[in-house]
Amino acid sequence: VGKYVYFITYRQTDPLFVADISNPTAPKLLGELEVSGFSEYLHMWDDTHVLGIGYGDSKQSKIKLTMFDVSDPTKPVEVNQKLIDSSESWSNEFVYNYKAILADPEKNLIGFTANDYYLFSYDSENGFSLLEQQALTYKNTEGYRGIYKDNDFYVAGNGEIKHFKLAE
């Protein structure tokens, strides 16, 4: 974002890298951070934080939400994490389709499917907070999406739509 890019290479330890691309013909690697597990998806949350969604272990039995502090691009830090059991999930669409993730920093919502539809919020003091967990009719959760209008939230997919109210 801006002159920095954030990426994961999926090599052996799957670190988060920060690079300066202000000179596109001479990019510079500034920092890296090795953490347990790995992120499949990265999303700039605000000016100094990157949201990571991936797995907390090599067996991919736990989904991991991670917030990285990148205020110092030479020393990224994992400031919060949340593990969610996904051992019974048939597939996690967010692994290969970024559209399967709802990441809205302005509304403070993070949503995705893994057996159920999970909706989280984030704040720096309390970390990730589960707002809602909606059971889905089908265990194949591909195609489910979370959408909202004002304080009405909907989970739609596979011929069904569910509604709940977001806290004001």
Predicted regions and their residues:
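Feature marking well-ordered beta-strand scaffolds used for ligand recognition
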Residues: 1-168
